[in-house]
A protein has these predicted regions:
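Active-site/acyl-donor-binding loops of N-acyltransferases
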Residues: 109-155, 329-400
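Conserved acetyl-CoA-binding loop-helix of GNAT-fold acetyltransferases
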Residues: 73-85, 312-325
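Short beta-strand-to-loop capping motifs
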Residues: 64-68, 150-153
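Conserved GNAT acetyl-CoA-binding A-motif
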Residues: 88-108, 328-339
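Short, contiguous acidic/charged loop-to-helix segments that flank catalytic cores in large enzymes
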Residues: 305-314, 339-343
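A conserved beta-strand-loop-helix scaffold within acyl/acetyltransferase catalytic domains
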Residues: 2-58, 102-107, 117, 127-141, ...
Protein backbone atom coordinates (compact mmCIF):
# COMPACT_ATOMS: atom_id res chain seq x y z
CA UNK A 1 0.00 0.00 0.00
CA UNK A 2 0.93 3.62 -0.57
CA UNK A 3 1.74 6.44 1.86
CA UNK A 4 -0.42 9.51 1.26
CA UNK A 5 -2.06 12.56 2.78
CA UNK A 6 -5.64 13.79 2.44
CA UNK A 7 -4.83 16.05 -0.51
CA UNK A 8 -3.22 13.19 -2.44
CA UNK A 9 -6.15 10.92 -1.64
CA UNK A 10 -8.71 13.47 -2.80
CA UNK A 11 -6.73 14.25 -5.94
CA UNK A 12 -6.79 10.59 -6.94
CA UNK A 13 -10.52 10.21 -6.24
CA UNK A 14 -11.37 13.43 -8.07
CA UNK A 15 -9.40 12.52 -11.19
CA UNK A 16 -10.35 8.85 -11.51
CA UNK A 17 -13.12 7.79 -13.88
CA UNK A 18 -14.71 5.75 -11.08
CA UNK A 19 -14.34 8.47 -8.43
CA UNK A 20 -17.36 9.55 -6.42
CA UNK A 21 -17.99 12.32 -3.89
CA UNK A 22 -18.74 9.71 -1.20
CA UNK A 23 -15.13 8.56 -1.43
CA UNK A 24 -13.78 12.06 -0.84
CA UNK A 25 -12.39 13.17 2.52
CA UNK A 26 -15.18 15.74 2.81
CA UNK A 27 -17.81 12.98 2.91
CA UNK A 28 -16.31 11.70 6.15
CA UNK A 29 -16.64 15.24 7.55
CA UNK A 30 -20.35 15.14 6.75
CA UNK A 31 -20.68 11.67 8.29
CA UNK A 32 -18.96 12.84 11.47
CA UNK A 33 -20.54 10.11 13.61
CA UNK A 34 -18.53 7.55 11.62
CA UNK A 35 -14.78 6.93 11.84
CA UNK A 36 -12.93 7.16 8.49
CA UNK A 37 -10.25 4.69 7.36
CA UNK A 38 -8.42 5.43 4.11
CA UNK A 39 -6.10 3.22 2.11
CA UNK A 40 -4.24 3.73 -1.16
CA UNK A 41 -2.34 1.42 -3.49
CA UNK A 42 0.39 2.32 -5.97
CA UNK A 43 2.32 0.79 -8.85
CA UNK A 44 5.67 2.21 -9.92
CA UNK A 45 5.20 5.05 -7.47
CA UNK A 46 1.84 6.14 -8.91
CA UNK A 47 -1.49 5.66 -7.08
CA UNK A 48 -3.75 3.13 -8.78
CA UNK A 49 -6.46 2.42 -6.20
CA UNK A 50 -7.97 3.97 -3.09
CA UNK A 51 -10.81 3.38 -0.69
CA UNK A 52 -12.42 5.23 2.18
CA UNK A 53 -14.24 3.12 4.74
CA UNK A 54 -16.56 4.61 7.32
CA UNK A 55 -16.83 2.49 10.45
CA UNK A 56 -19.30 2.43 13.30
CA UNK A 57 -20.09 -0.27 15.85
CA UNK A 58 -18.03 -2.85 13.98
CA UNK A 59 -19.50 -2.10 10.55
CA UNK A 60 -17.02 -0.96 7.89
CA UNK A 61 -18.74 0.54 4.87
CA UNK A 62 -17.22 1.83 1.61
CA UNK A 63 -19.89 3.77 -0.34
CA UNK A 64 -19.08 3.69 -4.07
CA UNK A 65 -15.71 2.19 -3.32
CA UNK A 66 -13.01 1.02 -3.75
CA UNK A 67 -12.01 3.35 -6.58
CA UNK A 68 -9.80 1.63 -9.18
CA UNK A 69 -9.74 0.21 -12.69
CA UNK A 70 -11.98 -2.83 -12.37
CA UNK A 71 -10.88 -4.18 -15.74
CA UNK A 72 -7.44 -4.82 -14.18
CA UNK A 73 -8.27 -8.14 -12.54
CA UNK A 74 -4.88 -8.53 -10.89
CA UNK A 75 -5.24 -5.13 -9.24
CA UNK A 76 -8.77 -5.92 -8.08
CA UNK A 77 -7.60 -9.19 -6.52
CA UNK A 78 -4.70 -7.51 -4.73
CA UNK A 79 -6.89 -4.71 -3.37
CA UNK A 80 -9.63 -7.06 -2.15
CA UNK A 81 -7.05 -9.28 -0.47
CA UNK A 82 -5.45 -6.32 1.29
CA UNK A 83 -8.84 -5.00 2.37
CA UNK A 84 -9.65 -8.33 4.00
CA UNK A 85 -6.43 -8.01 5.98
CA UNK A 86 -6.72 -4.36 7.08
CA UNK A 87 -10.39 -4.62 8.04
CA UNK A 88 -9.67 -7.71 10.13
CA UNK A 89 -6.77 -5.96 11.87
CA UNK A 90 -8.99 -2.90 12.35
CA UNK A 91 -11.58 -4.94 14.24
CA UNK A 92 -14.31 -5.02 11.61
CA UNK A 93 -17.21 -7.31 12.41
CA UNK A 94 -18.94 -6.73 9.10
CA UNK A 95 -17.58 -5.22 5.86
CA UNK A 96 -19.79 -3.78 3.13
CA UNK A 97 -18.53 -2.43 -0.19
CA UNK A 98 -20.50 -0.82 -2.98
CA UNK A 99 -18.14 -0.66 -5.99
CA UNK A 100 -18.74 2.14 -8.53
CA UNK A 101 -19.15 -0.30 -11.40
CA UNK A 102 -22.09 -0.45 -13.79
CA UNK A 103 -23.57 -3.73 -14.89
CA UNK A 104 -25.68 -2.03 -17.54
CA UNK A 105 -26.73 1.29 -19.02
CA UNK A 106 -29.84 1.83 -21.06
CA UNK A 107 -32.23 4.55 -22.10
CA UNK A 108 -35.46 4.75 -20.13
CA UNK A 109 -37.35 3.02 -22.95
CA UNK A 110 -34.66 0.82 -24.47
CA UNK A 111 -32.48 -2.07 -23.32
CA UNK A 112 -29.96 -1.88 -26.14
CA UNK A 113 -27.02 -0.32 -24.25
CA UNK A 114 -25.80 -3.22 -22.14
CA UNK A 115 -22.50 -3.91 -20.44
CA UNK A 116 -21.26 -7.47 -20.44
CA UNK A 117 -20.26 -9.55 -17.41
CA UNK A 118 -16.88 -8.43 -16.08
CA UNK A 119 -16.32 -11.30 -13.68
CA UNK A 120 -16.52 -8.89 -10.76
CA UNK A 121 -18.84 -11.05 -8.70
CA UNK A 122 -16.48 -14.01 -8.99
CA UNK A 123 -13.53 -11.95 -7.80
CA UNK A 124 -15.40 -10.80 -4.72
CA UNK A 125 -16.63 -14.33 -4.03
CA UNK A 126 -13.07 -15.67 -4.11
CA UNK A 127 -12.15 -13.23 -1.36
CA UNK A 128 -15.02 -14.36 0.86
CA UNK A 129 -17.57 -11.67 -0.01
CA UNK A 130 -21.24 -12.30 -0.74
CA UNK A 131 -23.06 -10.39 -3.44
CA UNK A 132 -26.36 -9.06 -2.08
CA UNK A 133 -28.19 -9.65 -5.32
CA UNK A 134 -29.82 -7.53 -7.99
CA UNK A 135 -32.84 -6.26 -6.10
CA UNK A 136 -34.78 -3.51 -7.84
CA UNK A 137 -36.21 -2.00 -4.65
CA UNK A 138 -34.80 1.41 -3.81
CA UNK A 139 -34.76 0.54 -0.10
CA UNK A 140 -32.88 -2.76 -0.48
CA UNK A 141 -29.40 -1.18 -0.55
CA UNK A 142 -27.81 1.75 1.27
CA UNK A 143 -27.01 3.50 -2.01
CA UNK A 144 -29.51 3.08 -4.86
CA UNK A 145 -28.50 0.51 -7.47
CA UNK A 146 -30.44 2.36 -10.15
CA UNK A 147 -29.91 5.99 -11.09
CA UNK A 148 -31.42 8.11 -13.83
CA UNK A 149 -28.75 10.21 -15.54
CA UNK A 150 -28.86 12.75 -18.35
CA UNK A 151 -25.86 12.97 -20.72
CA UNK A 152 -24.96 16.63 -21.17
CA UNK A 153 -23.86 16.41 -24.80
CA UNK A 154 -27.41 17.32 -25.74
CA UNK A 155 -29.02 20.64 -26.60
CA UNK A 156 -31.40 21.82 -23.90
CA UNK A 157 -34.35 22.12 -23.82
CA UNK A 158 -34.67 20.72 -27.36
CA UNK A 159 -33.55 17.28 -26.15
CA UNK A 160 -36.53 16.95 -23.81
CA UNK A 161 -39.86 15.41 -24.85
CA UNK A 162 -42.48 17.81 -26.19
CA UNK A 163 -44.61 17.73 -23.02
CA UNK A 164 -41.60 18.51 -20.83
CA UNK A 165 -40.69 21.50 -22.99
CA UNK A 166 -44.25 22.75 -22.66
CA UNK A 167 -44.16 22.43 -18.86
CA UNK A 168 -40.87 24.35 -18.74
CA UNK A 169 -42.39 27.15 -20.81
CA UNK A 170 -45.44 27.02 -18.57
CA UNK A 171 -43.29 27.65 -15.48
CA UNK A 172 -41.62 30.64 -17.13
CA UNK A 173 -45.00 31.98 -18.23
CA UNK A 174 -46.21 31.73 -14.62
CA UNK A 175 -43.32 33.87 -13.36
CA UNK A 176 -41.28 31.08 -11.77
CA UNK A 177 -37.65 32.12 -11.36
CA UNK A 178 -34.79 29.74 -10.54
CA UNK A 179 -31.71 30.98 -8.69
CA UNK A 180 -28.56 29.46 -7.23
CA UNK A 181 -28.52 30.31 -3.54
CA UNK A 182 -26.16 29.98 -0.60
CA UNK A 183 -26.36 28.36 2.80
CA UNK A 184 -28.29 31.39 4.07
CA UNK A 185 -31.35 30.16 2.12
CA UNK A 186 -31.42 26.71 3.70
CA UNK A 187 -34.43 27.70 5.78
CA UNK A 188 -36.39 28.21 2.54
CA UNK A 189 -35.15 24.87 1.21
CA UNK A 190 -36.30 23.17 4.40
CA UNK A 191 -39.85 24.38 3.76
CA UNK A 192 -40.09 22.37 0.54
CA UNK A 193 -38.22 19.44 2.11
CA UNK A 194 -40.75 19.32 4.96
CA UNK A 195 -43.60 19.57 2.45
CA UNK A 196 -42.13 16.60 0.57
CA UNK A 197 -41.72 14.61 3.79
CA UNK A 198 -45.36 15.22 4.70
CA UNK A 199 -46.63 14.35 1.22
CA UNK A 200 -44.65 11.12 0.89
CA UNK A 201 -44.66 10.05 4.55
CA UNK A 202 -40.85 9.93 4.71
CA UNK A 203 -38.06 11.53 6.70
CA UNK A 204 -35.23 13.13 4.74
CA UNK A 205 -32.51 15.24 6.38
CA UNK A 206 -32.20 18.05 8.90
CA UNK A 207 -31.09 21.58 8.16
CA UNK A 208 -27.88 20.86 10.09
CA UNK A 209 -27.11 17.99 7.73
CA UNK A 210 -27.48 20.18 4.65
CA UNK A 211 -25.36 22.86 6.31
CA UNK A 212 -22.65 20.28 6.92
CA UNK A 213 -22.63 19.48 3.18
CA UNK A 214 -21.98 23.14 2.41
CA UNK A 215 -19.25 23.33 5.04
CA UNK A 216 -17.52 20.15 3.87
CA UNK A 217 -17.77 20.48 0.08
CA UNK A 218 -17.76 24.26 -0.29
CA UNK A 219 -18.34 25.45 -3.84
CA UNK A 220 -19.03 21.90 -5.02
CA UNK A 221 -22.50 22.16 -3.44
CA UNK A 222 -25.19 24.33 -5.01
CA UNK A 223 -28.69 25.10 -3.79
CA UNK A 224 -31.30 25.82 -6.46
CA UNK A 225 -34.55 27.49 -5.42
CA UNK A 226 -37.55 28.19 -7.64
CA UNK A 227 -39.57 31.15 -6.42
CA UNK A 228 -42.39 33.47 -7.46
CA UNK A 229 -42.52 37.15 -6.56
CA UNK A 230 -46.30 37.17 -6.27
CA UNK A 231 -46.89 40.92 -6.13
CA UNK A 232 -44.66 41.52 -9.13
CA UNK A 233 -46.30 38.66 -11.02
CA UNK A 234 -49.79 40.01 -10.32
CA UNK A 235 -48.82 43.50 -11.46
CA UNK A 236 -47.16 42.30 -14.67
CA UNK A 237 -49.95 39.87 -15.50
CA UNK A 238 -52.60 42.53 -14.91
CA UNK A 239 -50.78 44.84 -17.32
CA UNK A 240 -50.59 41.98 -19.82
CA UNK A 241 -54.32 41.31 -19.36
CA UNK A 242 -55.24 44.96 -19.96
CA UNK A 243 -53.07 45.03 -23.07
CA UNK A 244 -54.87 41.98 -24.45
CA UNK A 245 -58.27 43.56 -23.75
CA UNK A 246 -57.21 46.71 -25.54
CA UNK A 247 -55.89 44.73 -28.49
CA UNK A 248 -59.16 42.79 -28.74
CA UNK A 249 -61.12 46.04 -28.83
CA UNK A 250 -59.09 47.25 -31.81
CA UNK A 251 -59.04 43.93 -33.64
CA UNK A 252 -62.17 44.57 -35.65
CA UNK A 253 -63.92 41.70 -37.37
CA UNK A 254 -60.95 39.35 -37.99
CA UNK A 255 -62.42 36.16 -36.44
CA UNK A 256 -59.19 34.17 -36.21
CA UNK A 257 -57.30 36.94 -34.44
CA UNK A 258 -60.29 37.66 -32.19
CA UNK A 259 -60.52 34.01 -31.18
CA UNK A 260 -56.79 33.84 -30.39
CA UNK A 261 -57.01 36.96 -28.25
CA UNK A 262 -60.05 35.60 -26.44
CA UNK A 263 -58.11 32.43 -25.50
CA UNK A 264 -55.14 34.50 -24.33
CA UNK A 265 -57.40 36.70 -22.22
CA UNK A 266 -58.99 33.66 -20.58
CA UNK A 267 -55.55 32.19 -19.92
CA UNK A 268 -54.33 35.46 -18.41
CA UNK A 269 -57.40 35.74 -16.19
CA UNK A 270 -56.90 32.16 -15.00
CA UNK A 271 -53.29 32.93 -14.11
CA UNK A 272 -54.32 36.07 -12.20
CA UNK A 273 -56.88 33.99 -10.29
CA UNK A 274 -54.27 31.31 -9.57
CA UNK A 275 -51.73 33.84 -8.32
CA UNK A 276 -54.42 35.36 -6.13
CA UNK A 277 -54.92 32.07 -4.30
CA UNK A 278 -51.32 31.88 -3.07
CA UNK A 279 -50.60 32.37 0.61
CA UNK A 280 -47.28 34.10 1.15
CA UNK A 281 -45.21 36.46 3.27
CA UNK A 282 -42.59 38.95 2.07
CA UNK A 283 -44.20 38.75 -1.42
CA UNK A 284 -42.21 35.65 -2.42
CA UNK A 285 -43.16 31.97 -2.35
CA UNK A 286 -40.71 29.07 -2.64
CA UNK A 287 -42.11 26.62 -5.16
CA UNK A 288 -39.43 23.93 -5.05
CA UNK A 289 -35.72 23.40 -4.59
CA UNK A 290 -32.82 21.04 -5.19
CA UNK A 291 -29.40 20.46 -3.65
CA UNK A 292 -26.73 19.57 -6.21
CA UNK A 293 -23.17 18.29 -5.72
CA UNK A 294 -20.30 18.22 -8.23
CA UNK A 295 -18.03 15.21 -8.47
CA UNK A 296 -15.40 14.51 -11.12
CA UNK A 297 -17.07 15.09 -14.51
CA UNK A 298 -20.63 14.81 -13.26
CA UNK A 299 -23.19 16.44 -11.02
CA UNK A 300 -25.85 14.80 -8.90
CA UNK A 301 -29.13 16.09 -7.52
CA UNK A 302 -28.83 14.81 -3.96
CA UNK A 303 -32.11 16.10 -2.58
CA UNK A 304 -35.12 17.81 -4.09
CA UNK A 305 -38.40 18.99 -2.63
CA UNK A 306 -41.61 20.62 -3.79
CA UNK A 307 -44.54 22.31 -2.08
CA UNK A 308 -47.73 20.74 -3.43
CA UNK A 309 -49.56 24.04 -3.03
CA UNK A 310 -47.62 25.28 -6.06
CA UNK A 311 -47.72 22.12 -8.19
CA UNK A 312 -49.67 23.90 -10.95
CA UNK A 313 -46.70 26.19 -11.58
CA UNK A 314 -44.45 23.38 -12.95
CA UNK A 315 -41.47 24.78 -11.07
CA UNK A 316 -39.76 21.41 -10.69
CA UNK A 317 -39.44 21.09 -14.47
CA UNK A 318 -37.83 24.48 -14.86
CA UNK A 319 -35.53 23.77 -11.89
CA UNK A 320 -34.24 20.45 -13.24
CA UNK A 321 -33.82 21.89 -16.74
CA UNK A 322 -31.88 24.85 -15.32
CA UNK A 323 -29.59 22.53 -13.35
CA UNK A 324 -28.86 20.49 -16.47
CA UNK A 325 -28.17 23.50 -18.64
CA UNK A 326 -25.89 25.06 -16.00
CA UNK A 327 -23.97 21.80 -15.63
CA UNK A 328 -23.46 21.62 -19.39
CA UNK A 329 -22.23 25.22 -19.57
CA UNK A 330 -19.81 24.48 -16.72
CA UNK A 331 -18.29 21.62 -18.72
CA UNK A 332 -19.70 18.61 -16.90
CA UNK A 333 -20.46 15.47 -18.89
CA UNK A 334 -23.44 14.05 -17.04
CA UNK A 335 -26.11 14.87 -14.47
CA UNK A 336 -27.58 12.24 -12.18
CA UNK A 337 -31.10 12.91 -10.97
CA UNK A 338 -30.53 10.40 -8.17
CA UNK A 339 -31.75 6.94 -7.34
CA UNK A 340 -34.97 5.27 -8.47
CA UNK A 341 -36.70 1.92 -8.10
CA UNK A 342 -35.49 -0.55 -10.68
CA UNK A 343 -38.96 -1.31 -11.99
CA UNK A 344 -39.24 2.37 -13.04
CA UNK A 345 -42.98 2.40 -12.30
CA UNK A 346 -43.08 4.66 -9.24
CA UNK A 347 -44.03 8.34 -9.35
CA UNK A 348 -40.43 9.49 -8.86
CA UNK A 349 -39.26 7.44 -11.85
CA UNK A 350 -42.11 8.71 -13.99
CA UNK A 351 -41.20 12.32 -13.20
CA UNK A 352 -37.50 11.83 -13.93
CA UNK A 353 -38.31 9.92 -17.13
CA UNK A 354 -39.75 13.14 -18.54
CA UNK A 355 -36.18 14.40 -19.07
CA UNK A 356 -35.34 11.46 -21.36
CA UNK A 357 -32.57 10.05 -19.13
CA UNK A 358 -30.42 6.97 -19.34
CA UNK A 359 -30.86 4.40 -16.59
CA UNK A 360 -27.67 3.09 -15.04
CA UNK A 361 -27.50 0.00 -12.86
CA UNK A 362 -24.69 -0.68 -10.39
CA UNK A 363 -23.58 -4.14 -9.32
CA UNK A 364 -24.71 -3.41 -5.78
CA UNK A 365 -23.31 -4.41 -2.42
CA UNK A 366 -20.74 -7.03 -1.46
CA UNK A 367 -20.65 -8.06 2.20
CA UNK A 368 -18.32 -10.05 4.42
CA UNK A 369 -19.01 -10.93 8.05
CA UNK A 370 -16.64 -12.05 10.79
CA UNK A 371 -18.96 -14.94 11.69
CA UNK A 372 -22.61 -16.01 11.50
CA UNK A 373 -23.58 -14.03 14.59
CA UNK A 374 -22.45 -10.71 13.11
CA UNK A 375 -24.05 -11.66 9.83
CA UNK A 376 -27.37 -12.02 11.67
CA UNK A 377 -26.86 -8.74 13.56
CA UNK A 378 -26.10 -6.60 10.51
CA UNK A 379 -28.41 -8.26 8.00
CA UNK A 380 -31.49 -8.86 10.12
CA UNK A 381 -31.46 -7.47 13.66
CA UNK A 382 -30.03 -4.03 12.88
CA UNK A 383 -32.23 -3.37 9.81
CA UNK A 384 -35.27 -4.43 11.85
CA UNK A 385 -34.33 -2.02 14.65
CA UNK A 386 -33.70 0.80 12.18
CA UNK A 387 -37.05 0.21 10.49
CA UNK A 388 -38.90 0.34 13.82
CA UNK A 389 -37.01 3.47 14.84
CA UNK A 390 -37.73 5.13 11.49
CA UNK A 391 -41.46 4.39 11.82
CA UNK A 392 -41.49 5.72 15.38
CA UNK A 393 -39.78 8.95 14.34
CA UNK A 394 -42.20 9.39 11.44
CA UNK A 395 -45.18 8.80 13.74
CA UNK A 396 -43.85 11.27 16.30
CA UNK A 397 -43.41 13.85 13.55
CA UNK A 398 -46.98 13.28 12.36
CA UNK A 399 -48.39 13.73 15.87
CA UNK A 400 -46.60 17.03 16.49
Amino acid sequence: MHEFDDDMFDAFISQHDNGNFMQRVAWADVKSEWLPHRFMWSQDGEPVAAVQFLSRKGLWYAPRGPVMDYTNTDLVSDVLRDISLVTRIGGAKYVKMDPPVLIRRKTANDNSLLYGETGLIGQFLREGYEHQGFSKALSSTIQPRYHMVVPLNRTFPDAFPKKTRRLIRDAVRKYVKVDICGVDRLDDFMKVIHATETRQGITLRSEQYFESLFNAFGDDVELYLATIDVNRALIEESVHYDRLIDERIHTGRAPKKYHQLQEQIQSSQSLIDLLGTLSFSNNTVVVCGALVISSNQSKEILYAGMNDEFSKFSGQYLTFATIMNDAKVQGFHELSMGGVDGDLNDSLSRFKSKFDPDVIEYYGEFDKSKNRWWKFVYRQALPMYQNIRHRALALRKTLK
